[in-house]
């Protein structure tokens, strides 16, 4: 009986040892998997920059609020206290009003119907609103010339309400989606860097591009005397600023087309899916390693106590 008991104890001890070795092997494999398949290997900052570059066409149109829109508005008739610089507030009002509608009515309704707008389609929608805003600026420019030629008068600054409101709606779709995707797909340790990279692609790169674009199209901003002083209606009427707006329209439409391309849509979706899978994968952190060591220690102590008994 004694030998049988010792043999049984040895069997249980051997089985327990094998079980512990199997568990330790699984834990090591899990740690190796987490270290090789972590988020850092899934998405890099270069990928974030490429993702954010998809909204550059919209942001080129968006940057016109502080440049060509102001130039156009400077030759328009003020409406009470509202002049060209004050019209920038229309963009903020648009973001607040339509942001509430889109965030609290449209998106919840789409979620209720289980409809998800792909990220690139949000970029395309934003770029489309940017193109519509530039289109309204083109119409306004033609109206400025028509009224000046017919009556020699300036048109109301309220004509610029449409471009500012439309660019604000586009900002809700394009810019907010860019910030969201840059933050969600970035590795946990690089989210701040990814947000900074996205901020550069949203605000920095488009502004640099606009500087070069303006210098290349400088002749369109000259009056009949060849001077860049077009803040008077007569001088503005002799310039060709509308050609610059048409170029911006083409750039914004290019952004729409690119974001609607199936390969671009599938690539962005694959990046988002890879980032989501990386989040689900356990990460080898100091806390996890500490917990694993403690579990091994507890099992070792429990096994020793069993053998002593």
Where are these regions (language model features)?
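Hydrophobic transmembrane alpha-helices of multi-pass solute transporters/permeases
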Residues: 1-284, 288, 295, 309
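Long, low-complexity Q/N-rich tracts
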Residues: 9, 301-305
């Amino acid at each position: 009986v004694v030998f049988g008991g010792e043999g049984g104890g040895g069997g249980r001890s051997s089985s327990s040892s094998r079980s512990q070795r199997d568990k330790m092997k699984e834990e090591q494999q899990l740690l190796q998997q987490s270290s090789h398949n972590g988020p850092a290997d899934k998405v890099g900052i270069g990928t974030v920059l490429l993702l954010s570059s998809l909204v550059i066409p919209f942001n080129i149109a968006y940057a016109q609020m502080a440049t060509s829109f102001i130039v156009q508005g400077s030759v328009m008739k003020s409406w009470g206290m509202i002049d060209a610089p004050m019209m920038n507030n229309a963009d903020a009002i648009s973001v607040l009003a339509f942001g509430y509608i889109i965030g609290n009515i449209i998106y919840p309704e789409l979620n209720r119907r289980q409809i998800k707008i792909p990220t690139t389609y949000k970029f395309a929608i934003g770029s489309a609103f940017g193109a519509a805003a530039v289109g309204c600026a083109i119409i306004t420019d033609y109206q400025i010339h028509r009224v000046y030629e017919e009556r020699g008068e300036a048109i109301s600054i309220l004509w610029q309400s449409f471009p500012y409101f439309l660019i604000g709606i586009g900002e809700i779709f394009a810019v907010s989606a860019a910030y969201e995707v840059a933050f969600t797909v970035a590795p946990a340790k690089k989210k701040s860097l990814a947000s900074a990279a996205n901020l550069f692609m949203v605000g920095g790169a488009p502004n640099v591009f606009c500087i070069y674009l303006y210098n290349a199209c400088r002749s369109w901003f000259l009056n009949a005397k060849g001077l860049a002083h077009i803040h008077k209606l007569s001088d503005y009427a002799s310039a060709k600023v509308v050609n610059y707006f048409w170029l911006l329209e083409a750039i914004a439409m290019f952004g729409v087309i690119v974001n609607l391309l199936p390969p671009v849509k599938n690539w962005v979706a694959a990046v988002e899916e890879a980032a989501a899978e990386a989040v689900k994968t356990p990460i080898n952190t100091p806390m996890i390693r500490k917990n694993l060591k403690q579990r091994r220690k507890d099992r070792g102590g429990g096994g020793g106590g069993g053998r002593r008994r």
